[in-house]
Regions:
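Conserved N-terminal catalytic core of the sugar/cofactor nucleotidyltransferase
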Residues: 1-8, 16, 30, 34-105, ...
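Short N-terminal binding/cap micro-motifs at the start of the first secondary-structure element
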Residues: 14-19, 135
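Conserved core of the sugar-phosphate nucleotidyltransferase
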Residues: 110-186
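Active-site metal-binding loops of divalent metal-dependent hydrolases
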Residues: 13, 108-109
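A structural signal for short hydrophobic beta-strand segments in well-ordered beta-sheet cores
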Residues: 28, 139-142, 211
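Left-handed beta-helix
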Residues: 181-329
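Short internal beta-strands
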Residues: 53-57, 128, 287, 303
Length: 329
């Protein structure tokens, strides 16, 4: 795929992922051994993206530190100082909307998609997926092979083709003009400047949009969907770490080399992150974050935050950063 610039909005607070987002921005929450944003950037870099604009907000300095410490991408950081919708976020990055095509990709969703399908596209294109209940998503209606209408979170379903958060914009200046119209005329939907409204305005002005199918679409916005994403990412891995003496690893798992695991059964679908300590425990279908301690316990479908400590009995729990929990029998 020819080199492409990516625009990645990551400003959201992540209220549905509390307590983990009390101390971290949502995109830095750990899944399968690294932050959500790390998996997204890894995929973009592997597919030829060489530069990006990252739109930060809540705890944006932590995002900047993570990206600059771990990636050599040419990255520009732009702050969204008010949470006024996705359209407003992209407007904050309007200097990146020039003549060359751009890829807008949401920073809290992991995709399994071959972006090379976009390189030969003459027109802008939206990633879509069929869903049973479209009321939580923006949706598209197509006529004659092109998008004719976009609707943000329709109360009455008009289409089951959900917009998943991947937008290939072949003429970014047209998007910039549409966003400028929304902002200048204070055109909001449900109190926010919606990107779907800007795209609809482009369609109304004659811009052509096609769609492309995205089968692998993994939301990281809630604890249960974060665990689903963890399962998917672990399943994709071929490497299996060797279990220390006295331990059993049931694939697929991720165990960071710096983690200490003693007398434990890990997996399936378990992630043990950097500096974590697991002793006398069973951990399955769970995420144990950096420097967390888990002992004398069986965990299932749980997320343990950074520097948290959990001991006790069989449980399904979500524990925020730096917490200490001792469960009695």
């Amino acid at each position: 795929m020819p080199t492409m610039h990516a625009i990645i909005p990551v400003a959201g607070i992540g209220t549905r992922l509390r307590p983990f987002t009390h101390s971290l921005p949502k995109v830095l929450v750990n899944v399968a051994g690294k932050p959500i944003l790390g998996h997204i950037l890894d995929s973009l870099v592997a597919q030829g993206v060489t530069s990006a604009t990252i739109i930060t907000g809540y705890k944006g300095e932590l995002v900047e530190d993570y990206v600059t410490s771990n990636y050599t991408l040419d990255v520009t950081f732009v702050e969204q100082d008010e949470m006024l919708g996705l359209g407003h976020a992209i407007w904050c990055a309007r200097e990146s909307l020039g003549d060359a095509p751009v890829l807008i990709i949401l920073g809290d969703t992991v995709f399994d998609v071959d972006l090379s399908v976009l390189s030969s596209r003459q027109f802008s294109s939206l990633g879509v997926k069929y869903v049973d209940d479209p009321r939580r998503f923006g949706v598209v209606i197509e006529e004659g092979g092109f998008v004719s209408r976009l609707v943000e979170k329709p109360e009455t379903p008009v289409s089951n083709m959900a917009i998943v958060g991947l937008y290939y914009i072949s003429r970014p200046t047209e998007l910039r003009n549409a966003l400028e119209t929304l902002i200048a005329n204070d055109l909001r939907t449900k109190g926010e400047y919606q990107l779907t409204d800007a795209l609809q305005l482009m369609v109304d002005r004659g811009e052509k949009f096609t769609t492309f199918s995205v089968d692998g679409w993994y939301d990281c916005g809630k604890p249960e969907t974060l665990l689903q994403t963890n399962r998917f990412l672990l399943t994709k891995r071929n490497a299996m770490p060797a279990a220390p003496q006295g331990c059993v690893f049931v694939p697929p798992v991720h165990v960071d080399p710096s983690a200490i695991v003693e007398h434990s059964v890990i997996g399936p679908y378990a992630s043990i992150s950097k500096g974590a300590v697991v002793r006398n425990a069973i951990v399955r279908d769970s995420i144990v974050s950096d420097a967390a301690t888990v002992s004398d316990i069986a965990l299932d479908q749980s997320i343990i935050g950074e520097n948290a400590e959990v001991t006790g009995r069989f449980s399904s729990i979500n524990i925020g950063d730096a917490s200490i929990v001792r469960l009695s029998q």
